[in-house]
């Protein structure tokens, strides 16, 4: 059945947005879906975003917290959950998206709320993500009953730095929520750029020229995403090609909220109030609301922070301090966007043997240092190449002070006064940009609009165990064979050199895969015998049994790889002795 609508969904750490447009219009008529949600017991209101918060209950859900036609298997999603988080922090799940990409925990196990140890209230990051997506699907079905969600063309955006496992978990959550099997992922920074192109119309070609280099800096509630895009020319027409994406950086609005909570706790301490763990978590949520107010366009000079006193709700009362806008701006601007040189680098993690289990926030919160490191890895290795344009995305950049500081810092890195930095403006709402850009991506694909080229955002490798005498207690060294080069276009294939490798068949085996965002020049068939720890990232291994033609054992094979139009890496292991072939598959798409 032909889809009636293009739908783009920004599944955000703090807020989620659904945008849509009729599929058959000659112009992209993009709108944002008002999302029904509980705002108070017994009250349902429509908002243009869905706060990514989930209030948990023991037992059946009270009818005052239900919406007709909405599935609510896990609790209350949206505005009421966000609002109540400061009062009941141990019952509200927040930052599930950040936990979904936390590779050192089981993201399918009940972990959240992290502060609550009750098994009845805890939920997995995967299930929490499913709850948010389920609410969005139900909101669509309620308002477009003649156009079932599963029959539309859907794009779900993810951070450019999301690894394979995080994308697979997100895909699982989406399918469970009611997405069609053929929905696609799109990188959030690319979606933001598509939104800017849509906002400019044909005028974007007058603002950019050949050899310009764009930095998309996307700082959201949980992550910082960096993407480089270069303007190229093909047969007289300007084109956009992605050069690189940054590493996964767990820095965003959540870190800022924690920073303000630390500042506020000192204010409470100066009044003789030492906060306990429950109060500290409550303060974190209160600081999130305060930050949003104090950094808004019409911000007050200060906001009160009210925390329940120790003891019961009735006996303890509340304690309060005022948080000043000037302190908030100076603390966050200097802490997260300090003026640094192009050669400054973020500090590495500590060497403490034991660390508390929790979200793996970056040890260094200076976003400007991470930008410098990113450009050092991908841009400034080429002489005379510089950033010519900057595109902001993410709710953090609603604050003018953050934008101004980043422009000043990056501008200071350019070598001459003529190397000016141009900010790409004209975006009315940064909170809706990604969802709207995802819709325009689909429209452009169908109607011949500009497409951002770039292929795979990473290079991919398979782990090959080396041969040699066994040494007791020492595993054999592992080599990495490049099977997909950086930027390999979807729909293409390549032969992986002439190297023969032994493939284990007839027995369950563990296949190890790696990816890299920094090794952009490795060729198919290139064998790495050693690499720096920060160059390759191992993805979750694949354990499977490949059928044996004869007796189980090692079969000499050569490789061919193909990246399909759906973003699947197909690795063909072809026998060097017979016509037998085996295929392994990995999802590698973070953008089409």
Residue spans of the language-model regions?
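Conserved phosphate-binding catalytic cores of ATP/NTP-utilizing and phosphoryl-transfer enzymes
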Residues: 1-4, 184-217, 376-379, 432-451
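Early-domain small/polar-rich strand-loop-helix modules and first-structured segments
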Residues: 1-109, 184, 235-240, 247, ...
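Phosphate-binding loop and its immediate beta->loop->alpha context
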Residues: 28-177, 258-304, 308-350
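Phosphate/ATP-binding catalytic cores across multiple sugar-kinase/actin-like superfamilies
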Residues: 131-147, 192-207, 335-387, 405, ...
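Hydrophobic, small-residue-rich alpha-helical packing segments that form membrane-like cores
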Residues: 140-145, 153, 160-164, 168-223, ...
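Glycine-rich phosphate-binding loops at beta-strand->alpha-helix junctions
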Residues: 154-169, 308-312, 359-364, 383-409, ...
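Conserved phosphate-binding/catalytic loops in two-lobed NTP-binding clefts
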Residues: 178-191, 360, 406-437
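Acidic low-complexity intrinsically disordered segments
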Residues: 309-380, 449-592
């Amino acid at each position: 059945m032909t889809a009636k609508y293009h739908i783009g969904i920004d599944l955000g750490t703090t807020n989620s947005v659904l945008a849509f447009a009729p599929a058959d219009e000659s112009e992209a008529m993009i709108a944002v879906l008002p999302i029904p949600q509980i705002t108070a017991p017994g009250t349902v209101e429509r908002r243009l975003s869905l706060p990514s918060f989930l209030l948990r209950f023991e037992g059946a859900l009270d009818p005052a917290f239900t919406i007709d036609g909405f599935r609510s298997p896990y609790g209350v999603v949206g505005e009421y959950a966000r609002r109540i988080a400061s009062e009941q922090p141990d019952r509200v799940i927040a930052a599930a998206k950040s936990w979904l990409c936390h590779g050192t925990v089981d993201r399918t196990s009940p972990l959240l709320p992290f502060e609550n140890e009750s098994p009845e209230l805890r939920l997995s990051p995967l299930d929490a993500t499913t709850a948010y997506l389920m609410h969005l699907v139900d909101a669509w079905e309620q308002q477009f009953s003649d156009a079932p969600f599963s029959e539309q063309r859907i794009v779900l955006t993810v951070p450019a730095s999301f690894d394979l496992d995080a994308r697979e978990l997100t895909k699982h959550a989406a399918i469970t929520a009611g997405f069609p099997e053929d929905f696609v992922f799109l990188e959030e920074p690319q979606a933001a750029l598509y939104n800017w192109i849509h906002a400019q119309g044909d005028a974007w070609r007058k603002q950019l020229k050949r050899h310009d280099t764009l930095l998309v800096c996307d700082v959201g509630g949980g992550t910082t995403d960096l993407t480089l895009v270069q303007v190229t020319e093909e047969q007289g027409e300007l084109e956009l090609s992605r050069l690189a994406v940054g590493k996964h950086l767990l820095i965003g609005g959540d870190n800022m909220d924690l920073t303000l909570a630390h500042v506020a706790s000192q204010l409470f301490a100066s009044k003789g109030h030492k906060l306990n763990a429950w109060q500290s978590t409550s303060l974190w949520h209160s600081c999130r609301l305060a930050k949003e107010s104090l950094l808004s366009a019409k911000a007050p000079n200060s906001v009160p922070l009210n925390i329940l006193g120790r003891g019961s709700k009735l006996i303890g009362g509340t304690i309060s301090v005022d948080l000043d806008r000037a302190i908030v701006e100076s603390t966050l601007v200097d802490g997260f966007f300090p003026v640094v040189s192009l050669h400054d680098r973020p500090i590495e993690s500590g060497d403490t043997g034991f660390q508390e289990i929790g979200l793996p926030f970056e040890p260094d919160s200076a976003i400007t240092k991470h930008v410098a490191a990113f450009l050092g890895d991908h841009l400034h290795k080429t002489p005379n190449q510089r950033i010519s344009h900057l595109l902001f995305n993410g709710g953090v950049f609603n604050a003018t002070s953050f934008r101004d500081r980043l422009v000043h810092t990056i501008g200071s890195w350019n070598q001459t006064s003529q190397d000016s930095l141009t900010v790409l403006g004209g975006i009315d709402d940064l909170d809706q940009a990604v969802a709207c850009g995802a819709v325009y991506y689909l429209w452009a694909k169908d109607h011949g609009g500009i497409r951002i080229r770039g292929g795979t955002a990473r290079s991919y490798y398979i782990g090959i165990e080396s041969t040699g005498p066994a040494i007791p207690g020492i595993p054999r060294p592992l080599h990495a064979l490049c099977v997909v080069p950086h930027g390999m276009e979807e729909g293409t294939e390549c032969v992986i050199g002439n190297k023969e490798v032994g493939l284990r068949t007839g027995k369950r085996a563990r296949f190890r895969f790696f990816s890299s965002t920094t090794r952009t020049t490795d060729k198919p068939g290139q064998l790495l015998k050693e690499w720096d720890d920060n160059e390759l990232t191992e993805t979750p291994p694949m354990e499977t049994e490949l059928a044996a033609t004869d007796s189980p054992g090692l079969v000499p094979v050569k490789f061919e790889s193909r990246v399909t139009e759906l973003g699947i890496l197909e690795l063909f292991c072809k026998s060097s002795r017979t016509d037998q072939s085996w295929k392994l598959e990995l999802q590698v798409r973070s953008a089409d």
